[in-house]
Amino acid sequence: MPEPCLLMQCESSPKEEEIPSLFWGLDPVFLAFAKLYIKDILEMKESQQVPGMYFYNGHPIRRVDIMGAVISVKERETFYSYGVDDATGVINCVCWKRPSNAESSSDPAILSTSRELSMTSQLKKLQETIEQKTKIGIGDIIRVRGYVRMFREEREICATIYYKVDDPVWNMQIARMLELPELYKKVYDQPFRNPALKEEEALNSKDTLDLAGLTALLSEKVKEFLQEKKVQSFYQKELEMVEPLQSLASQPVTHSTCSDQVELKNDAASDIHSVFKNALHLLQEKGFVFQRDGGSDKLYYVTSKDKDLHQKIYQIIKEDCQKPNLWCMLPQEAWRGTEEGLAVVVTLSVCLPLPVDVEKGCHLMHVLNCVLLNLRWDLNKAVLQQVLELLEDQSDIVSTGDHYYTAF
Protein backbone atom coordinates (compact mmCIF):
# COMPACT_ATOMS: atom_id res chain seq x y z
CA MET A 1 0.00 0.00 0.00
CA PRO A 2 1.31 3.55 -0.73
CA GLU A 3 2.26 5.68 2.24
CA PRO A 4 -0.63 7.99 3.31
CA CYS A 5 -0.23 11.69 3.82
CA LEU A 6 1.31 12.36 7.22
CA LEU A 7 -0.98 15.32 7.79
CA MET A 8 -3.98 13.02 7.70
CA GLN A 9 -2.70 10.77 10.50
CA CYS A 10 -4.34 12.75 13.27
CA GLU A 11 -4.98 11.25 16.66
CA SER A 12 -8.31 11.33 18.39
CA SER A 13 -8.39 14.07 20.97
CA PRO A 14 -8.21 12.38 24.40
CA LYS A 15 -9.33 15.47 26.27
CA GLU A 16 -12.55 16.03 24.34
CA GLU A 17 -15.68 15.48 26.38
CA GLU A 18 -17.70 12.46 25.30
CA ILE A 19 -20.98 13.29 23.57
CA PRO A 20 -24.10 11.71 25.14
CA SER A 21 -25.27 8.60 23.28
CA LEU A 22 -28.66 10.24 22.67
CA PHE A 23 -27.05 12.46 19.99
CA TRP A 24 -24.88 9.86 18.26
CA GLY A 25 -27.47 9.23 15.56
CA LEU A 26 -27.19 12.86 14.42
CA ASP A 27 -23.68 12.14 13.13
CA PRO A 28 -23.73 10.43 9.69
CA VAL A 29 -20.48 8.66 10.55
CA PHE A 30 -22.31 6.70 13.26
CA LEU A 31 -24.17 4.47 10.77
CA ALA A 32 -21.41 4.32 8.15
CA PHE A 33 -18.38 2.09 7.73
CA ALA A 34 -15.72 4.68 8.53
CA LYS A 35 -12.76 4.56 6.15
CA LEU A 36 -9.95 5.18 8.62
CA TYR A 37 -6.25 4.48 8.74
CA ILE A 38 -5.40 1.45 10.88
CA LYS A 39 -3.23 3.66 13.08
CA ASP A 40 -6.28 5.75 14.01
CA ILE A 41 -8.43 2.65 14.59
CA LEU A 42 -5.89 1.36 17.09
CA GLU A 43 -5.66 4.73 18.88
CA MET A 44 -9.38 5.61 19.04
CA LYS A 45 -10.74 6.28 22.50
CA GLU A 46 -13.32 3.76 23.70
CA SER A 47 -16.68 5.03 24.91
CA GLN A 48 -17.38 5.06 28.63
CA GLN A 49 -21.13 4.84 27.99
CA VAL A 50 -21.43 1.94 25.55
CA PRO A 51 -18.79 -0.82 25.31
CA GLY A 52 -17.69 -1.47 21.74
CA MET A 53 -18.14 2.16 20.66
CA TYR A 54 -15.16 4.37 19.89
CA PHE A 55 -14.54 8.05 19.18
CA TYR A 56 -12.40 9.83 16.61
CA ASN A 57 -12.57 13.64 16.91
CA GLY A 58 -15.92 13.29 18.65
CA HIS A 59 -17.37 11.07 15.88
CA PRO A 60 -18.96 7.89 17.31
CA ILE A 61 -17.54 4.92 15.39
CA ARG A 62 -18.34 1.24 15.60
CA ARG A 63 -17.93 -0.03 12.05
CA VAL A 64 -14.86 0.53 9.87
CA ASP A 65 -13.70 -0.12 6.32
CA ILE A 66 -10.01 -0.88 5.72
CA MET A 67 -7.82 -2.01 2.84
CA GLY A 68 -4.29 -3.34 3.17
CA ALA A 69 -1.79 -6.09 2.55
CA VAL A 70 -2.07 -9.43 4.32
CA ILE A 71 1.09 -10.08 6.36
CA SER A 72 -0.09 -13.10 8.37
CA VAL A 73 -2.69 -15.86 8.00
CA LYS A 74 -4.04 -18.16 10.70
CA GLU A 75 -6.72 -20.70 9.87
CA ARG A 76 -9.12 -22.04 12.46
CA GLU A 77 -12.07 -24.40 12.18
CA THR A 78 -14.66 -21.68 11.58
CA PHE A 79 -12.67 -18.56 10.67
CA TYR A 80 -9.49 -17.07 9.26
CA SER A 81 -7.38 -14.58 11.16
CA TYR A 82 -5.60 -12.12 8.86
CA GLY A 83 -3.03 -9.56 9.88
CA VAL A 84 -3.67 -6.51 7.67
CA ASP A 85 -1.14 -3.71 7.11
CA ASP A 86 -2.03 -0.40 5.40
CA ALA A 87 1.40 1.23 5.98
CA THR A 88 0.19 3.07 9.10
CA GLY A 89 -0.32 0.06 11.35
CA VAL A 90 -1.28 -3.59 11.59
CA ILE A 91 -4.59 -4.93 12.88
CA ASN A 92 -5.98 -8.44 13.19
CA CYS A 93 -9.15 -9.21 11.20
CA VAL A 94 -11.39 -12.17 12.07
CA CYS A 95 -13.06 -13.36 8.86
CA TRP A 96 -15.62 -16.15 9.23
CA LYS A 97 -15.54 -19.03 6.78
CA ARG A 98 -18.42 -19.43 4.39
CA PRO A 99 -20.70 -22.38 5.23
CA SER A 100 -20.09 -25.43 3.07
CA ASN A 101 -22.82 -27.75 1.82
CA ALA A 102 -20.44 -30.44 0.57
CA GLU A 103 -21.46 -33.13 3.05
CA SER A 104 -25.20 -32.68 2.76
CA SER A 105 -25.15 -32.30 -1.02
CA SER A 106 -23.19 -35.55 -1.51
CA ASP A 107 -25.65 -37.67 0.48
CA PRO A 108 -27.28 -40.08 -2.03
CA ALA A 109 -30.39 -40.34 0.12
CA ILE A 110 -31.09 -36.68 -0.51
CA LEU A 111 -30.22 -36.64 -4.20
CA SER A 112 -33.15 -38.56 -5.66
CA THR A 113 -32.69 -37.80 -9.36
CA SER A 114 -29.77 -37.64 -11.74
CA ARG A 115 -30.71 -34.06 -12.65
CA GLU A 116 -30.37 -32.96 -9.04
CA LEU A 117 -27.06 -34.82 -8.79
CA SER A 118 -25.74 -33.11 -11.90
CA MET A 119 -26.84 -29.69 -10.72
CA THR A 120 -25.30 -30.22 -7.29
CA SER A 121 -21.98 -31.37 -8.73
CA GLN A 122 -21.84 -28.33 -10.98
CA LEU A 123 -22.54 -26.01 -8.05
CA LYS A 124 -19.87 -27.78 -6.01
CA LYS A 125 -17.30 -27.34 -8.78
CA LEU A 126 -18.26 -23.68 -9.13
CA GLN A 127 -17.86 -23.18 -5.39
CA GLU A 128 -14.43 -24.84 -5.44
CA THR A 129 -13.35 -22.65 -8.35
CA ILE A 130 -14.50 -19.51 -6.54
CA GLU A 131 -12.67 -20.54 -3.37
CA GLN A 132 -9.45 -21.16 -5.30
CA LYS A 133 -9.68 -17.84 -7.12
CA THR A 134 -10.47 -15.92 -3.95
CA LYS A 135 -8.14 -17.72 -1.58
CA ILE A 136 -6.27 -15.12 0.41
CA GLY A 137 -2.60 -15.52 1.18
CA ILE A 138 0.32 -13.48 2.45
CA GLY A 139 1.01 -10.51 0.19
CA ASP A 140 -2.53 -10.28 -1.18
CA ILE A 141 -4.55 -7.08 -0.88
CA ILE A 142 -7.73 -7.49 1.15
CA ARG A 143 -10.63 -5.20 1.91
CA VAL A 144 -12.46 -5.70 5.20
CA ARG A 145 -15.64 -4.17 6.57
CA GLY A 146 -16.65 -4.97 10.10
CA TYR A 147 -16.98 -4.09 13.78
CA VAL A 148 -14.16 -2.97 16.02
CA ARG A 149 -13.87 -5.03 19.20
CA MET A 150 -11.42 -5.96 21.96
CA PHE A 151 -10.11 -9.54 22.25
CA ARG A 152 -7.52 -10.47 24.85
CA GLU A 153 -6.71 -6.80 25.40
CA GLU A 154 -5.99 -6.24 21.71
CA ARG A 155 -8.14 -4.34 19.26
CA GLU A 156 -9.32 -6.25 16.20
CA ILE A 157 -11.95 -6.17 13.46
CA CYS A 158 -14.71 -8.77 13.29
CA ALA A 159 -15.52 -8.82 9.57
CA THR A 160 -19.01 -8.82 8.14
CA ILE A 161 -17.72 -8.50 4.55
CA TYR A 162 -14.26 -9.28 3.25
CA TYR A 163 -12.78 -10.10 -0.13
CA LYS A 164 -9.52 -10.28 -2.00
CA VAL A 165 -8.82 -7.20 -4.11
CA ASP A 166 -7.70 -8.01 -7.65
CA ASP A 167 -5.58 -4.93 -8.31
CA PRO A 168 -2.51 -5.80 -10.42
CA VAL A 169 -1.80 -2.20 -11.48
CA TRP A 170 -2.72 -0.57 -8.12
CA ASN A 171 -5.75 1.29 -9.45
CA MET A 172 -7.93 0.67 -6.40
CA GLN A 173 -5.10 1.27 -3.95
CA ILE A 174 -4.18 4.59 -5.53
CA ALA A 175 -7.84 5.63 -5.63
CA ARG A 176 -8.16 4.87 -1.92
CA MET A 177 -4.91 6.68 -1.17
CA LEU A 178 -6.41 9.80 -2.80
CA GLU A 179 -9.85 9.31 -1.23
CA LEU A 180 -8.82 9.02 2.42
CA PRO A 181 -7.11 12.44 2.79
CA GLU A 182 -10.26 14.10 1.40
CA LEU A 183 -12.49 12.16 3.79
CA TYR A 184 -10.29 13.13 6.72
CA LYS A 185 -10.26 16.77 5.68
CA LYS A 186 -14.01 17.09 5.04
CA VAL A 187 -15.46 14.64 7.58
CA TYR A 188 -13.31 12.93 10.17
CA ASP A 189 -11.11 15.91 11.10
CA GLN A 190 -14.18 18.13 11.48
CA PRO A 191 -15.10 17.58 15.16
CA PHE A 192 -18.64 16.43 15.87
CA ARG A 193 -19.97 18.61 18.67
CA ASN A 194 -22.90 18.22 21.01
CA PRO A 195 -25.92 19.70 19.14
CA ALA A 196 -27.57 20.58 22.44
CA LEU A 197 -24.76 23.04 23.19
CA LYS A 198 -24.65 24.79 19.80
CA GLU A 199 -27.56 27.13 20.50
CA GLU A 200 -26.25 28.00 23.94
CA GLU A 201 -22.77 28.67 22.58
CA ALA A 202 -24.19 30.85 19.80
CA LEU A 203 -26.02 32.96 22.36
CA ASN A 204 -23.10 33.16 24.77
CA SER A 205 -20.29 33.77 22.29
CA LYS A 206 -20.69 37.55 22.32
CA ASP A 207 -17.01 38.17 21.67
CA THR A 208 -16.98 36.30 18.37
CA LEU A 209 -20.48 36.85 16.92
CA ASP A 210 -20.37 39.40 14.11
CA LEU A 211 -23.26 41.46 12.75
CA ALA A 212 -24.01 39.06 9.90
CA GLY A 213 -24.04 36.12 12.29
CA LEU A 214 -26.32 37.96 14.71
CA THR A 215 -28.73 38.84 11.89
CA ALA A 216 -28.85 35.23 10.65
CA LEU A 217 -29.37 33.90 14.17
CA LEU A 218 -32.12 36.43 14.88
CA SER A 219 -33.92 35.54 11.64
CA GLU A 220 -33.96 31.87 12.66
CA LYS A 221 -35.29 32.75 16.12
CA VAL A 222 -37.99 34.96 14.61
CA LYS A 223 -38.98 32.13 12.27
CA GLU A 224 -39.21 29.68 15.18
CA PHE A 225 -41.26 32.17 17.20
CA LEU A 226 -43.74 32.76 14.37
CA GLN A 227 -44.14 29.03 13.77
CA GLU A 228 -44.54 28.22 17.46
CA LYS A 229 -47.14 30.95 18.04
CA LYS A 230 -48.85 30.29 14.67
CA VAL A 231 -48.73 33.99 13.81
CA GLN A 232 -50.51 35.01 10.60
CA SER A 233 -49.46 38.68 10.39
CA PHE A 234 -47.41 41.07 12.48
CA TYR A 235 -45.65 44.42 12.62
CA GLN A 236 -41.91 44.69 13.12
CA LYS A 237 -42.38 46.76 16.27
CA GLU A 238 -44.42 43.91 17.77
CA LEU A 239 -41.48 41.55 17.36
CA GLU A 240 -39.16 44.11 18.91
CA MET A 241 -41.25 43.91 22.09
CA VAL A 242 -40.75 40.14 22.50
CA GLU A 243 -38.25 39.85 25.33
CA PRO A 244 -36.11 36.89 24.09
CA LEU A 245 -35.84 38.38 20.60
CA GLN A 246 -35.08 41.86 21.92
CA SER A 247 -32.39 40.47 24.22
CA LEU A 248 -30.76 38.64 21.33
CA ALA A 249 -30.86 41.69 19.02
CA SER A 250 -29.32 43.97 21.66
CA GLN A 251 -26.28 41.83 22.43
CA PRO A 252 -22.79 43.12 21.54
CA VAL A 253 -21.37 42.29 18.12
CA THR A 254 -17.85 42.21 16.76
CA HIS A 255 -16.90 44.03 13.59
CA SER A 256 -13.68 42.87 11.93
CA THR A 257 -11.23 45.45 10.61
CA CYS A 258 -7.97 45.02 8.74
CA SER A 259 -5.76 44.96 11.82
CA ASP A 260 -7.93 44.22 14.82
CA GLN A 261 -11.45 43.63 16.05
CA VAL A 262 -13.57 46.37 17.53
CA GLU A 263 -16.54 45.50 19.73
CA LEU A 264 -19.62 47.64 19.23
CA LYS A 265 -22.76 47.55 21.35
CA ASN A 266 -26.25 47.80 19.93
CA ASP A 267 -27.72 49.65 22.91
CA ALA A 268 -29.61 52.24 20.88
CA ALA A 269 -33.16 51.53 19.78
CA SER A 270 -32.21 52.42 16.21
CA ASP A 271 -29.56 49.69 16.17
CA ILE A 272 -32.03 47.10 17.44
CA HIS A 273 -34.55 48.26 14.85
CA SER A 274 -31.93 47.87 12.12
CA VAL A 275 -31.02 44.32 13.20
CA PHE A 276 -34.69 43.30 13.18
CA LYS A 277 -35.18 44.90 9.77
CA ASN A 278 -32.24 42.96 8.31
CA ALA A 279 -33.45 39.72 9.92
CA LEU A 280 -36.92 40.14 8.41
CA HIS A 281 -35.33 40.96 5.06
CA LEU A 282 -33.58 37.57 5.18
CA LEU A 283 -36.91 35.87 5.83
CA GLN A 284 -38.42 37.78 2.89
CA GLU A 285 -35.63 36.60 0.60
CA LYS A 286 -36.33 33.02 1.67
CA GLY A 287 -40.06 33.48 1.04
CA PHE A 288 -41.14 32.83 4.62
CA VAL A 289 -42.79 36.26 5.01
CA PHE A 290 -43.93 38.99 2.61
CA GLN A 291 -45.50 42.44 2.55
CA ARG A 292 -48.40 43.68 0.50
CA ASP A 293 -46.97 47.19 0.78
CA GLY A 294 -43.29 48.01 1.15
CA GLY A 295 -41.75 49.61 4.23
CA SER A 296 -40.60 48.26 7.58
CA ASP A 297 -43.56 49.95 9.31
CA LYS A 298 -46.04 48.02 7.15
CA LEU A 299 -47.71 44.75 8.03
CA TYR A 300 -45.81 41.50 7.43
CA TYR A 301 -47.66 38.32 6.45
CA VAL A 302 -46.51 34.74 7.06
CA THR A 303 -46.60 33.06 3.65
CA SER A 304 -47.82 29.66 4.82
CA LYS A 305 -50.70 31.21 6.83
CA ASP A 306 -52.08 33.70 4.28
CA LYS A 307 -55.06 31.81 2.84
CA ASP A 308 -56.09 34.86 0.79
CA LEU A 309 -52.80 34.77 -1.13
CA HIS A 310 -53.13 31.02 -1.65
CA GLN A 311 -56.62 31.40 -3.09
CA LYS A 312 -55.69 34.27 -5.43
CA ILE A 313 -52.71 32.39 -6.85
CA TYR A 314 -54.84 29.27 -7.29
CA GLN A 315 -57.48 31.28 -9.17
CA ILE A 316 -54.84 32.82 -11.46
CA ILE A 317 -53.51 29.39 -12.40
CA LYS A 318 -56.98 27.89 -12.82
CA GLU A 319 -58.29 30.70 -15.03
CA ASP A 320 -55.21 31.25 -17.19
CA CYS A 321 -54.75 27.54 -17.87
CA GLN A 322 -57.99 27.71 -19.85
CA LYS A 323 -56.68 30.50 -22.10
CA PRO A 324 -54.61 29.00 -24.94
CA ASN A 325 -52.00 31.02 -26.83
CA LEU A 326 -51.58 33.44 -23.94
CA TRP A 327 -48.07 34.86 -23.61
CA CYS A 328 -46.43 35.97 -20.39
CA MET A 329 -45.86 39.70 -19.92
CA LEU A 330 -42.92 40.26 -17.59
CA PRO A 331 -42.02 43.65 -16.07
CA GLN A 332 -38.58 44.74 -17.22
CA GLU A 333 -36.61 47.75 -16.05
CA ALA A 334 -36.46 50.16 -18.99
CA TRP A 335 -34.92 53.32 -17.52
CA ARG A 336 -33.31 54.36 -14.26
CA GLY A 337 -32.58 57.96 -13.30
CA THR A 338 -33.16 60.67 -10.74
CA GLU A 339 -35.79 63.32 -10.42
CA GLU A 340 -35.55 66.03 -7.77
CA GLY A 341 -32.94 64.01 -5.92
CA LEU A 342 -35.07 60.85 -5.79
CA ALA A 343 -34.32 57.62 -7.62
CA VAL A 344 -36.83 56.88 -10.37
CA VAL A 345 -37.24 53.55 -12.13
CA VAL A 346 -39.50 53.15 -15.15
CA THR A 347 -40.69 49.60 -15.88
CA LEU A 348 -42.32 48.32 -19.03
CA SER A 349 -44.07 45.02 -19.67
CA VAL A 350 -42.45 43.11 -22.49
CA CYS A 351 -43.54 39.87 -24.12
CA LEU A 352 -41.24 36.96 -23.37
CA PRO A 353 -41.54 33.42 -24.78
CA LEU A 354 -43.24 31.85 -21.76
CA PRO A 355 -46.61 30.76 -23.18
CA VAL A 356 -49.53 29.45 -21.20
CA ASP A 357 -50.36 26.00 -22.50
CA VAL A 358 -53.60 24.11 -21.90
CA GLU A 359 -51.70 20.91 -21.15
CA LYS A 360 -48.54 22.25 -19.50
CA GLY A 361 -50.26 25.05 -17.61
CA CYS A 362 -48.86 28.39 -16.40
CA HIS A 363 -45.21 29.19 -16.02
CA LEU A 364 -44.04 30.34 -12.58
CA MET A 365 -42.94 33.74 -13.92
CA HIS A 366 -46.33 34.26 -15.57
CA VAL A 367 -48.08 33.71 -12.24
CA LEU A 368 -45.67 36.09 -10.51
CA ASN A 369 -46.28 38.74 -13.14
CA CYS A 370 -50.06 38.46 -12.73
CA VAL A 371 -49.75 38.87 -8.97
CA LEU A 372 -47.50 41.93 -9.33
CA LEU A 373 -49.70 43.61 -11.95
CA ASN A 374 -53.14 42.75 -10.59
CA LEU A 375 -52.65 42.68 -6.83
CA ARG A 376 -49.81 45.24 -6.62
CA TRP A 377 -48.31 43.30 -3.72
CA ASP A 378 -44.63 43.33 -2.86
CA LEU A 379 -43.94 39.66 -3.61
CA ASN A 380 -40.80 37.94 -4.79
CA LYS A 381 -40.16 34.64 -6.53
CA ALA A 382 -39.31 32.83 -3.28
CA VAL A 383 -42.72 33.67 -1.78
CA LEU A 384 -44.50 32.40 -4.88
CA GLN A 385 -42.51 29.16 -4.82
CA GLN A 386 -43.50 28.64 -1.18
CA VAL A 387 -47.18 29.06 -2.06
CA LEU A 388 -46.94 26.78 -5.10
CA GLU A 389 -45.35 24.07 -2.97
CA LEU A 390 -48.16 24.39 -0.40
CA LEU A 391 -50.84 24.19 -3.09
CA GLU A 392 -49.13 21.19 -4.64
CA ASP A 393 -48.96 19.46 -1.24
CA GLN A 394 -52.71 20.04 -0.88
CA SER A 395 -53.27 18.57 -4.38
CA ASP A 396 -54.85 21.83 -5.59
CA ILE A 397 -52.29 22.15 -8.39
CA VAL A 398 -49.75 19.87 -10.01
CA SER A 399 -46.36 20.53 -11.58
CA THR A 400 -46.39 19.47 -15.23
CA GLY A 401 -42.84 20.38 -16.12
CA ASP A 402 -39.99 22.74 -15.41
CA HIS A 403 -41.72 25.57 -13.47
CA TYR A 404 -45.08 24.88 -15.15
CA TYR A 405 -48.22 24.34 -13.07
CA THR A 406 -51.83 23.50 -13.79
CA ALA A 407 -54.91 23.48 -11.54
CA PHE A 408 -57.50 20.75 -11.11
From Swiss-Prot:
Name of the protein in its database record: CST complex subunit STN1
Chain intervals for the UniProt region annotation (Winged helix-turn-helix (wHTH) 1): 201-304, 305-408
Location(s), subcellular: Nucleus; Chromosome, Telomere
Keywords: Chromosome, DNA-binding, Nucleus, Telomere
Gene Ontology molecular function: any one: single-stranded telomeric DNA binding
Membership in a protein family: Belongs to the STN1 family.
DNA-binding region boundaries: 64-165
Organism: Rattus norvegicus (Rat)
Entry GO CC: chromosome, telomeric region; CST complex; nucleus
Main location: nucleus
GO terms under biological process: negative regulation of telomere maintenance via telomerase; positive regulation of DNA replication; telomere capping; telomere maintenance; telomere maintenance via telomere lengthening
Assembly description: Component of the CST complex, composed of TEN1/C17orf106, CTC1/C17orf68 and STN1; in the complex interacts directly with TEN1 and CTC1. Interacts with ACD/TPP1, POT1 and POLA1.
Keyword hit for DNA-binding: yes
